[in-house]
Design a protein with these regions (language model features):
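Short beta-strand-to-loop capping motifs
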Residues: 7-9, 43-49
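Long, contiguous binding/interaction regions
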Residues: 2-4, 8-39, 54-55, 59-79
């Protein structure tokens, strides 16, 4: 079973990498970009028997390792 985890900084958390990207885009004359938020995408392939078991397992991975839940939110998508 394949899954994708999308990890983004929570609203209100400063995103210096996103701001650096925005400034670089502006310097390249992409002046219509109002803001940029950078995140992470992690693709996983699991040996789970059910979608529910896969989601439970991935949630545990996110809580323990993949995401810093103090400042990041994550979204799980089964592919």
């Amino acid at each position: 079973m394949k899954a994708r985890v999308i990890i983004m900084l929570k609203d209100g958390v400063l995103d210096p990498q996103g701001e650096a990207i925005k400034q670089a885009l502006t310097s390249l004359e992409y002046n219509k970009v109002n803001s940029v938020r950078q995140g992470k995408v992690i693709d996983l392939e699991l040996n789970e028997s059910s979608e529910e078991a896969a989601i439970d397992s991935i949630q545990e991975m996110c809580e323990k390792l993949l995401a810093n839940t103090v400042i990041e939110n994550y979204e799980i998508k089964l592919l």
